[in-house]
Amino acid sequence: MKKILYIDMDNVLVDFPSAFERVTETEKIKYRDDMDEIPNIFSKMDPIPNAIESFEILSKHFDTYILSTAPWENPSAWSDKLNWVKTHLGQSAYKRLILSHNKNLNKGEYLIDDRPANGAKDFEGEWIHFSSDRFPDWDSVVRYLVN
């Protein structure tokens, strides 16, 4: 039986700042303190370099799920994240999307996340801190998990 692996979206699979060049100046001013509340912002993001290829590799070795959080104040975020997964990871991946503000409630061996927030630091398995010194990029994560 494959081990369970959860992967966060924002700044792990998805390059959150890449959307800023696709929003209007008016939106930047209006939402300057809450950029994740810009309507449809999550649909404007590019993948992190090597994220898609790494997801495909890891999916062959693990029972892989996408575990992300969406802001309550941005109703489009929930559907935007689903559509992003369908577009970039394919039809089979979207049925593996879990949106939760309590990541620690999920059972599994690994969680790849860039922040300790929303229960990541309390996850019962191993938290792989993406973009840290130990795991600065997808190549380092794949090397660690597959080798």
Model-derived regions, located:
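Active-site donor-binding segments of glycosyltransferases and PAPS-dependent sulfotransferases
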Residues: 75-103
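Active-site neighborhood of HAD-like aspartate-dependent phosphohydrolases
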Residues: 1-43, 134
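Conserved Lys-Pro-Asp/Glu-containing loop-to-beta segment of HAD-superfamily phosphomonoesterases
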Residues: 4, 94-122
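Acidic, Mg2+-coordinating phosphoryl-transfer loop and its flanking beta/alpha structural elements
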Residues: 110-143
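Substrate-recognition element of Asp-dependent hydrolases with the DxDx(T/V) motif
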Residues: 46, 51-79, 85
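Short catalytic/ligand-binding loop motif for oxyanion handling, primarily in non-cytosolic enzymes
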Residues: 14-16, 66, 73-77, 105-107, ...
